[in-house]
Amino acid sequence: MLRELLTASHLMSMEQLPGAVCEYAKDVGVHDVLIYVADLQQTVLRLLTGKGHDAGRDPGDEVAEYPIQGTLPGRAYQTVEAVTGRVFDDGRCERWLPVLDGAERIGVIRVTIRTDDAQAMADAEYLAGIVALIIVSKGPYSDSLSRLMRTGPMTVSAEIQWRLMPPLTFANDQVVIGAALEPAYRLGGDTFDYALAGDTVHLAVFDAMGHDTAAGLTSALAVAACRNARLQGAGLVETGQRIEDELVEQAGGRFVTAALAELNIRTGDLSWVLYGHPEPVVLRGGRKVRELKCSPGTPLGTDLEIVPEVCTVQLEPGDRLLLYSDGIIEARDPDRHEFGFQRFVDFIVRSNADGMAVPETLRRLIHSILGHHDGRLDDDATVLLLEWHGPHGVPRDDMAPIKSP
C-alpha cells in the first residue's frame, strides 16, 4: 500500500490526495481515511476534501473543522499520540493519528480499523507519515493548501515572512528547535532562521523597524544576507557585518535588531552576538533561569560600526535556550499591563515541568500572549526555543514519531 501510494504521489496534486489515500489504504484494512491540516495559528484542524478553491469544500456529513483545544483530534495533535475515538459494535473503531514531518506537526488523520487488527494499526501510523511527506512536498506550490490553512486575510509583509521562514519545528536525536510568531496574518519586521551544518546549529532572530511592508522587506534582506554569509563560512561577527553592509546599501536607512547564535551539539558550546536585541535566556533543571549578558553592537543598518562582543557559555543536557523579540514581553492587556519577562519565563518553566514538548509549549505560549492582549497584538512577537539533549542525544528507540498509549 505504502509503495503504491508513494509511487502515485509523484504525479498527484493536492486535490487528488484525499481520494488516493482512501483508495490505497483500504487494501490493508484501513478505511474511511480523513485528512485534517492545522491552520497557521494552530487553533483549528481543517478537513482536506480535495474540492473547491481551498481543497476543503463539500465535506458531506463529515466535520469540516475541529478546534485543537478540547477535541479528540486536537488531543492527538497536541500530544503527538494516537487517540481512540468511537468504538463500534462490530469490532471497528476510529483512530486519530498525528501527521508529522519529522517533528513538524502538519495535522491529523482519522481512520476506521478493526480493534483486533494490529497490522492495520501499524499501517495506519505509516500511512500518516506518508501523508505528511506528500503534503510537505506538494505544499510549496499548492494555493489550495495555503488557502485552507488560513482563517483570515494576510498582509503582503506577512506573505513575505511566511515564505521565507524554515519550518516551525525541527528535531534530531540531539536537539529540538521550535518557533512561534504572531500576529500571523499581519507580521511586519519579525522573523527567525535556523540551520544545521554538521555539528553546528545556527540560530537567528530579527526584528526590523516598523510594521509595514518595508519592514518585511528589510527583515527579508537581513535573512538573505545572513544565509549568504553563513553558507560562505562566515563567523558570527562577520555575518553581522555582511548584514549591516547590505542594509546600509539597500534598505534606505532602515535597521534591524538581531540575535545570532551557534551551538555545537556535540560539546554544548554556545556562542552568540547581539545587535540591539533582547538577551537570550537559558532554562536549566526545569527552574533555574539565566539571562545571557553580552555587550551588544548597535542595530544592523545604522552604520555606527559598534562591533558586538562574541560571548560563550557551556550548555548542559536538558537546557532550553530562548531567543525572542521584544514583542513577546511587551504585549499589553487592555489595562496596559505588559505580559512581562517573568510571566514569559515562568510559562516556559511550568511547561517544562509538565513534560510538555517544545512545539506544544510554544503553541500555548503564543496563544497565552494573544489572550493577554485581547487577541490582537500591536507589535510582532517572535520566540525561538532550542532544547539540547546532550552529546549522546536521545536513544532512537525513544524517538518514535507517534506514541500509542
Name each region found by the language model.
Residues 18-80, 275-276, 297:
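Structured interaction and signal-relay segments at domain junctions
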Residues 116-136, 221-224:
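Amphipathic alpha-helical "output/dimerization" segments
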Residues 19-31, 153, 157-166, 216-296, ...:
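Catalytic core of PPM/PP2C metal-dependent serine/threonine phosphatase domains
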Residues 83-86, 91-102:
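A short, aliphatic-rich beta-strand micro-motif
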Residues 119-122, 212-232, 296, 320-373, ...:
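Active-site-proximal, acidic helix/loop segment immediately C-terminal to a metal-coordinating Asp/Glu
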Residues 199-212, 272-274, 314-335, 385:
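Conserved beta-strand-loop-short alpha-helix elements that form
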Residues 90, 258, 294-335, 375-378:
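Acidic loop->beta-strand submotif enriched in PP2C/PPM serine/threonine phosphatases
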Residues 126-187:
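Regulatory cytosolic signal-relay segments
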